[in-house]
């Protein structure tokens, strides 16, 4: 049986953690930032955990993570 392929788009967006969860970047921080408040932009910094409802699909896209 051949190896399973990793979805490259998923590997660029998600990072696996040792406990089995994944972290992801925040959306809504690319452009049209002038109408967003400073507080809103500050809260969009950093990373978030992938929600448990999406974990199954992320694990399927990254079988070796």
UniProtKB/Swiss-Prot annotation:
InterPro entries assigned to the protein according to its UniProt record, in alphabetical order: Ribosomal_bL35, Ribosomal_bL35-like, Ribosomal_bL35_CS, Ribosomal_bL35_sf
Basic residues bias (residue ranges): 1-15, 26-44
Annotated PROSITE patterns: RIBOSOMAL_L35
Transmembrane feature ranges: none
Keyword Ribonucleoprotein recorded: yes
Pfam families assigned: Ribosomal_L35p
Any one biological process term the GO annotation gives: translation
Gene Ontology cellular-component annotations: cytosolic large ribosomal subunit
One of the record's GO molecular function terms: structural constituent of ribosome
Record keywords: Ribonucleoprotein, Ribosomal protein
Positions in coiled-coil regions: none
Region feature (Disordered): 1-65
Top-level division of the source organism's lineage: Bacteria
Annotated family: Belongs to the bacterial ribosomal protein bL35 family.
HAMAP family with a match to the protein in the record: Ribosomal_bL35
Protein name: Large ribosomal subunit protein bL35
Species, as recorded: Cupriavidus necator (strain ATCC 17699 / DSM 428 / KCTC 22496 / NCIMB 10442 / H16 / Stanier 337) (Ralstonia eutropha)
């Amino acid at each position: 049986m051949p190896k399973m392929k990793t979805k490259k788009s998923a590997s660029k967006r998600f990072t696996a953690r040792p406990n089995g969860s994944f972290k992801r970047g925040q959306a809504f921080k690319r452009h049209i930032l002038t109408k967003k408040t400073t507080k809103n932009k500050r809260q969009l910094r950093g990373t978030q955990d992938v929600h448990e409802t999406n974990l199954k699909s992320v694990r399927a896209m990254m079988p070796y993570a």
